Design a protein with these regions (language model features):
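Membrane-integral, polyisoprenol-dependent glycosyltransferases
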Residues: 2-202
Length: 202
């Protein structure tokens, strides 16, 4: 039975891969659907699984309550060992939930997880983009699907922490650096004029 399930999933993956390799639009659509299928189960229902997740969520909650978006605090203790950006993203996510009328938004843990889910999805799409610097569309889709199917990224997508968003920024920098590196090896006749987009992404 297990072997049949593996065979079925392999067949689905192969069909999705072949369909996605036809165009960039299809690739992005398939990767998003595949990644959501990997990340969404349990996203809204799981209780905090990591000891740090409640600390991140509580610090972001206090940030909203005090309206102090500079000094990060967990209860009465300063929490300056993590980038402030993740707290801003979590606070923004909860604020959007409040504006949409979500009941008890500040105590709804999955709202604090939305930046991590978004970061994980971005990491998958950026892996596809980064791989296109080296390989054709088909292998690039496969690389992104492999990342989406990893257990660790699936776990991080469910946690209100920094790692999924950090991964997305790292993959973006790697993709930009790869393109700049490949351009540096071209002759002057082949190389395009240096633009501002890749350095900005890096």
């Amino acid at each position: 039975m297990f072997a049949n399930a593996i065979t079925f999933l392999t067949g689905i993956s192969r069909v999705s891969h072949d369909y996605a390799a036809a165009s960039h639009r299809r690739a992005v659509m398939v990767l998003l659907l595949f990644a959501l299928a990997c990340f969404l189960p349990g996203f809204f229902t799981l209780q905090p699984m990591d000891r740090d997740e409640p600390r991140f969520a509580q610090a972001s909650k206090q940030m909203l309550e005090t309206r102090d978006f500079v000094r990060i605090r967990f209860q009465d203790t300063a929490r300056n060992n993590k980038p402030a950006g993740i707290y801003w993203l979590q606070s923004a996510s909860v604020s959007v939930g409040q504006s949409l009328g979500l009941e008890d938004a500040r105590r709804t843990v999955w709202l604090y997880r939305l930046p991590s889910l978004t970061g994980a999805l971005a990491a998958v799409l950026l892996t596809y983009w980064a791989a296109l610097a080296f390989v054709a569309r088909g292998p690039a889709v496969l690389a992104a699907m492999l990342l989406a199917s990893t257990i660790l990224l699936g776990v991080e997508a469910h946690l209100a922490k920094t790692d999924a968003v950090l991964l997305a920024t790292i993959v973006a920098a790697m993709g930009a650096f790869a393109r700049m590196y490949l351009q540096s090896g071209q002759s002057q006749a082949e190389a395009a004029l240096p633009g501002w987009r890749l350095p900005l992404v890096f």
